[in-house]
């Protein structure tokens, strides 16, 4: 099945199953070996150093139902500097950059402990970063059907809860061909009546939602009023 682990340290136990980074896929074993569909497959295996794959590590973050994997990116990177997180409860993926070389879940310690390539030890999931942050989430390219028609977006119908509305800003970019120039269609603020007017067209549309004030918020499903247009 070509499910060989990329390194011994990438094998992680999480409850009643284990998971690991294979040479070209992510796998899990709970009595049978399964290939795990991975939305960020290309991010892992296109970025990963061919020479230093053996330095990949994995760790369990049980409080959040997460498995973390660190890996080196680029030909000259000898130690892990990027990570991918699989939430096995929600089956969602996260990515990022972080210098970590090992991970120990909570147990002997109250919090997960991780070390970096310089020998420093960090307590994870402890406290918050200081200073203002701009959290956001961004979609991949959205298309109508097989991408053979242009999409005209006329209206945005958001679903948001915040202490003071509107708490979020939504922005769009688009392309008329996958390899074409990306066009910025600007930002839109969620209106209190639940409708935000817009008018732009593209074959591929990407959406980005950003918090615009320092407050808690929740984001539900965002609906778009989209009409198909011609093929050119």
Could you tell me what each predicted segment is?
Residues 3-17, 23-232:
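Beta-sheet repeat architectures centered on beta-propellers
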């Amino acid at each position: 099945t070509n499910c060989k682990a990329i390194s011994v340290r990438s094998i992680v136990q999480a409850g009643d199953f284990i998971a690991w980074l294979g040479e070209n896929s992510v796998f899990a074993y709970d009595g049978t070996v399964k290939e795990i569909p991975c939305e960020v497959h290309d991010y892992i295996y296109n970025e990963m150093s061919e020479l230093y794959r053996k330095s990949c590590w994995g760790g369990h973050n049980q409080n959040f139902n997460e498995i973390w994997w660190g890996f080196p990116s680029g030909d000259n990177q000898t130690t892990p500097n990027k990570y991918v997180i699989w939430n096995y409860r929600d089956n969602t993926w996260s990515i990022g950059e972080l210098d970590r070389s090992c991970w120990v879940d909570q147990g002997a310690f109250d919090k997960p402990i991780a070390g970096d390539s310089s020998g420093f030890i960090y307590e994870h999931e402890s406290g918050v970063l200081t200073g203002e942050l701009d959290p956001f989430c961004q979609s991949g390219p959205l298309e109508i059907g097989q991408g053979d028609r242009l999409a005209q977006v006329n209206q945005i119908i958001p679903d948001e809860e915040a202490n003071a509305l509107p708490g979020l800003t939504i922005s769009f970019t688009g392309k008329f061909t996958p390899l074409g120039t990306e066009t910025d269609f600007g930002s839109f603020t969620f209106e209190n009546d639940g409708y935000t007017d817009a008018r732009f067209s593209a074959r591929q549309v990407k959406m980005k939602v950003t918090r615009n004030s320092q407050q808690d918020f929740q984001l539900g499903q965002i609906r778009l009023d989209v009409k198909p247009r011609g093929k050119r």
